[in-house]
């Protein structure tokens, strides 16, 4: 179900709690909300739809990837960029990495590891920051 985007900075500044299998419904809510905002959005974290759980979604090409309890394992190739966010107005400078490796659980609660480069890596890092309460 599509959800309203949270813009409350105090709420977004809180560290998200680990997800469990009871939170699998968030995959559909995040997917529906991402699709509804596809003109201006390429990724979301669960706190952006009002749920303080460690769940993110982002587009990897045409395929939305949902990650439960993602953990950044490694990063390489730092660079400076500017990003926007549905929860904020405007763009802000930030540091990102060209290549990252992330472990997570998928929608079937299976452990996965993925290496991302370029724009998908940037999106994933942005959403991982949301889980830590870091706002660009």
Label every PLM stretch briefly.
Residues 1-136:
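Positively charged
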